[in-house]
């Protein structure tokens, strides 16, 4: 959610900043801007809309080797050119970009900035105006920066230019991700490493409430007390090709096709030398010492958590609760005596999940993060991490991270089951290999998926997904995918709940996508399909081989029933993708959405 880049060196800063912002497009944004230190002062370019539009207004003839850039996802103030970053102080001495939310910005306005005329509706402008006010009291820029930050409550990642000190960028962070990249006679700033892989793979991780003075040949990290901190850079384990589409028209389609490889990679990463599943002994012991597992997540990760609950309870016979992170803090249940928390987040930066983690850490409870980004905030602040090994996921709508989460959760459940002496009736690694094979088959059936999307979804206003048992949870994820990228009003329901109200919405032609992968509820979901057909619905039944019946729209390759969610979701991802194409929607960057949701 939002993205920051910065560059200081000898090269053309404008192009590096623009390319960096393009690499951050996946995070979601509605406007973008850059500011560069030119010969006659700081020049700001910003636009509502795509970075391509911003490129059109950037003057190629302006020479600059220092600058900052930003993609904005609106929180305070509508998406507009005025509200886009960078923002400047009244005198234009200071120019600033900011990710996060300043919770007390109105109070700061009232107490310190009564005489300032504000240009935008944003909380961000308060920071840059406060910076100017603090300098006006006689403080040095560094002192003013520290004072300014001490007066702010909330989250921030900040990049600041000072027109009177053009050879440095001031940087700070609190509860919002930010890295400093190290180069040869240049340095960079970025919300994540992908933005600046074009110039370096060496990055320094910043901690909360740290200030950094970035110059061409040096990086100085200090705490809010002004004490210098030494920290070595790390090498980003990414390749520039990982964040390119290659021959694919969209990242989403590329990432759907990568899922078989991801599953095989996960199997390999979590096997010991004997081919047995083997997790960290400390993770296993911490879970075995607990009396209940609490899974905390948002969105797609929450849906993965629902399936994960089934894995853990069925395999390991341990009780599990799954909670939406944004509600957990306000409605925390009565916890058991020895709870263990699992946080699921693709980015590892989800603000709602982090807020809960902070609470449970303060309570002294052990926590595990399942994430695609080791070294992320959740990974650092939890006791343990299980990586997804899915590779960068660029499309806003999650696909391969979801199936990776399911695979890792199944491995975790099997490992705990083994430690408890619970015997599975199947070989998990073998069956996951069959899942990967089935995924390959499904990814080769794109024409069939396109035809289903055209038949059922090309012109509809709404759509319902139904399933029983674990198919219900897969249906929730299918509905989310469809609404995210095609803007169809799509909802997932438990098949048995239709008659308790939702069936009132069924009318002639309403598409209902039904999942039938579980033998013990196959007849039940078939009965639900008949109920909606009787009211005029247009049914699309996706069943598992061996459970299919005449009239089914698509039959999945057979896999072990427990792992059916990993294959059942593939057609739903592809159908959503093609529905979005038929409706001429922006598949990789859907409106109003952000990939990494870093505000609460």
Curated annotation (Swiss-Prot):
Keywords: Aminotransferase, Cytoplasm, Glutamine amidotransferase, Repeat, Transferase. It is found in: Cytoplasm. It catalyses: D-fructose 6-phosphate + L-glutamine = D-glucosamine 6-phosphate + L-glutamate. InterPro entries: GATase_2_dom, GFAT, GFAT_N, GlmS/AgaS_SIS, GlmS/FrlB_SIS, Ntn_hydrolases_N, SIS_dom, SIS_dom_sf. GO terms for molecular function: carbohydrate derivative binding; glutamine-fructose-6-phosphate transaminase (isomerizing) activity. Its EC number is 2.6.1.16. PROSITE patterns: GATASE_TYPE_2, SIS. It is an enzyme of class 2 (transferase). Residues 2-217 form the Glutamine amidotransferase type-2 domain. The keyword Secreted does not apply. GO terms for biological process: carbohydrate metabolic process; fructose 6-phosphate metabolic process; protein N-linked glycosylation; UDP-N-acetylglucosamine metabolic process. CDD domains: GFAT, SIS_GlmS_GlmD_1, SIS_GlmS_GlmD_2. GO terms for cellular component: cytosol. The active site is at 2 (nucleophile), 595 (for fru-6p isomerization activity). Its main location: cytoplasm. Residues 283-422, 452-590 form the SIS domain. Disulfide bonds: none annotated. Catalyzes the first step in hexosamine metabolism, converting fructose-6P into glucosamine-6P using glutamine as a nitrogen source. Homodimer. This is Glutamine--fructose-6-phosphate aminotransferase [isomerizing]. It comes from Bacillus thuringiensis subsp. konkukian (strain 97-27).
């Amino acid at each position: 959610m939002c993205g920051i880049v910065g560059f200081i060196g000898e090269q053309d800063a404008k192009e590096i900043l623009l390319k960096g912002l393009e690499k951050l497009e996946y995070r979601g944004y509605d406007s973008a801007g850059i500011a560069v230190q030119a010969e006659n002062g700081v020049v700001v370019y910003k636009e509502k809309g795509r970075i391509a539009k911003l490129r059109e207004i950037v003057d190629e003839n302006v020479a600059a080797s220092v600058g900052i850039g930003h993609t904005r996802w609106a929180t305070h103030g509508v998406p507009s050119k005025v509200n886009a970053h960078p923002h400047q102080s009244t005198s234009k001495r200071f120019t600033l970009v900011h990710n996060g939310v300043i919770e007390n910005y109105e109070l700061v306005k009232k107490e310190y900035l009564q005489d300032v005329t504000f240009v935008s509706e944003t909380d961000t402008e308060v920071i840059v105006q406060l910076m100017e006010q603090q300098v006006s009291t006689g403080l040095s820029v560094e002192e003013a920066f520290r004072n300014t930050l001490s007066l702010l409550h909330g989250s921030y990642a900040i990049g600041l230019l000072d027109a009177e000190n053009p050879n440095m960028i001031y940087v700070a962070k609190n509860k919002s991700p930010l890295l400093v990249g190290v180069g040869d006679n240049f340095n960079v700033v970025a919300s994540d490493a992908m933005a600046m892989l074009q110039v370096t793979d060496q990055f320094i991780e910043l901690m909360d409430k740290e200030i950094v003075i970035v110059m061409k040949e040096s990086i100085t990290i200090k705490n809010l007390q002004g004490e210098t901190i030494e920290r070595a850079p790390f090498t980003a384990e990414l390749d520039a090709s990982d964040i390119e589409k290659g021959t694919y028209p969209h990242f989403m389609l590329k990432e759907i096709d990568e899922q078989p490889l991801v599953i095989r990679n996960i199997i390999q990463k979590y096997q010991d030398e004997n081919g047995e599943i083997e997790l960290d002994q400390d993770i296993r012991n911490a879970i075995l010492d607990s009396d209940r597992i609490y899974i905390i997540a948002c969105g797609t990760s929450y849906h993965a958590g629902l399936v994960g609950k089934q894995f853990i309870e069925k395999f390991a016979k341990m009780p599990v609760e799954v909670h939406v992170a944004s509600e957990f803090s306000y409605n925390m249940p009565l916890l058991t005596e020895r709870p263990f928390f699992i946080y699921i987040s693709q980015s590892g930066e989800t603000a709602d999940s982090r807020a809960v983690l902070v609470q449970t850490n303060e309570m002294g409870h052990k926590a595990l993060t399942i994430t695609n980004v080791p070294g992320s905030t959740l990974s650092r602040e939890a006791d343990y991490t299980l990586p997804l090994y899915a590779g960068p996921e660029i499309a806003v709508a999650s696909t391969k991270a979801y199936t990776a989460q399911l695979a890792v959760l199944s491995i975790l459940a099997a490992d705990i089951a083994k430690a408890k002496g619970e015997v599975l009736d199947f070989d998990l690694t073998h069956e996951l290999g069959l899942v990967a094979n089935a995924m390959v088959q499904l990814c080769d059936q794109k024409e069939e998926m396109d035809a289903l999307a055209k038949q059922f979804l090309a012109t509809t206003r709404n759509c319902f997904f139904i399933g029983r048992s674990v198919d219900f949870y897969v249906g929730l994820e299918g509905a989310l995918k469809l609404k995210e990228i095609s803007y169809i009003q799509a909802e997932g329901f438990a098949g048995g709940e239709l008659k308790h109200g939702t069936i009132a919405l069924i009318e002639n032609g309403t598409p209902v996508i039904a999942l039938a992968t579980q033998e013990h509820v196959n007849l039940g979901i078939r009965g639900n399909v008949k109920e909606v057909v009787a009211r005029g619905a247009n049914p699309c039944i996706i069943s598992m081989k061996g459970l299919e019946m005449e009239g089914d729209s698509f039959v999945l390759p057979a896999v072990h029933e427990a792992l059916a969610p990993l294959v059942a979701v593939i057609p739903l991802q592809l159908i959503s993708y093609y529905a979005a194409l038929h409706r001429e929607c922006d598949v990789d960057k859907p409106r109003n959405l952000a990939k990494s949701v870093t505000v609460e």
